[in-house]
Structure formats: C-alpha cells, structure tokens
C-alpha cells in the first residue's frame, strides 16, 4: 500500500513513518521533500518563504508519481498547499487540479496528524508556532474540503489520539481497506 502522512511541523510525522515501516513488512519510507532538497544543496530561508514551499510541493508531486509500491511518504502535496495557504496564497493558483489529482490518486491512504492538546503536551515545542498553527488549520480545511476535487475517493485517517499507538491505528485502518 501507498500511504501519505501529512501534518504541520512538530506533530510526529517522521516518527510515525518510521514506526509504520517497522510494523509493515516490505514498506519503505520516502523522506520529506525538505530533506531531499537539502541534500541537493537547496538553501531554505529562515523563516521559510512561499518559494521554499513551492519547491517542496514540486518534489512532493514528483515523488507521488513514482511507481514504487509499499511506501510511506513523509508529507504529501497537501502539506505544502496548506503552508502556501498560510502564507496567503490560493491553492488554485499553486497547482493544476489534474496534476494534484494524478499525484494524490496514487495513494491508498492519507493519514493526517492535526495539532491536539495531547500532542502539544507530549511532543517537544516546535519552531515558528504561528506558522505551525496557521498551517494546521489550513491543512484540515484543504484535506476535508478537497477544493480542487483531487482526492474524492481517497480514504483519510485523522489521528487525534496520543502519539503512542498511532502506527497500530493506521495498520488497523489499512487492514480494513484491503
């Protein structure tokens, strides 16, 4: 199965991706676009700019179009659309609906990690709290609203519980999809 994990920074996405790959035989992790771009020498601004998020969006779209099976993606295009929306950009101006649909339709499950009081207590404080909160709100609006009609049939699992045990919840959800 192809699983995408989305959420604002500091919500435990990478940890969940690693746990899922340990739990699911044959699944491989795909690093988030930020790390891949850094490895290629991209220099990000501090704080990040819209162009930084556009670069990550392009990489994320490309990664999802790869034919690999049994992968867990650390971030999806919706993450970067949410960051761009938090920067005041309209998602319709950032990506063509058919390009987004092509990428998102390659997923079997989208897992979303929203900010919750519990994760705020249990996880370390993240940088740029204002951007983090703004992105979280935009992400949930985009995921549930699907304004470009790009993932009408994609199952979405929103994990609002504690970080411990998230991978098992995802595995149970996957079993129900097979």
Residue ranges, per PLM feature:
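Conserved substrate/cofactor phosphate-moiety recognition/catalytic segment
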Residues: 18-62
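Glycine-rich phosphate-binding loop used to anchor ATP phosphates in small-molecule kinases
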Residues: 51-105, 114
């Amino acid at each position: 199965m192809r699983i995408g994990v989305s959420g604002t920074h500091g919500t435990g996405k990478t940890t969940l991706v690693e746990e899922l790959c340990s739990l699911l035989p044959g699944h491989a992790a795909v690093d988030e676009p930020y790390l891949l771009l850094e490895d290629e020498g991209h220099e990000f601004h501090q704080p990040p700019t819209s162009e930084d998020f556009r670069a990550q969006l392009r990489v994320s779209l490309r990664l999802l179009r790869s034919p690999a099976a049994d992968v867990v993606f650390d971030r999806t295009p919706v993450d970067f659309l949410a960051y761009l929306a938090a920067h005041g950009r309209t998602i319709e101006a950032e990506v063509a609906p058919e390009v987004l649909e092509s990428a998102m339709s390659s997923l079997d499950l989208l897992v979303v990690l929203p900010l919750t009081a519990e994760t705020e207590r249990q996880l370390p404080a993240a940088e740029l709290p204002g951007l983090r909160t703004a992105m979280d709100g935009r992400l949930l609006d985009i995921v549930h609203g699907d304004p470009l009609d790009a993932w009408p049939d994609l199952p979405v699992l929103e994990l609002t519980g504690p970080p411990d045990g998230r991978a098992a919840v995802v595995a149970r959800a996957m079993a129900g999809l097979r």
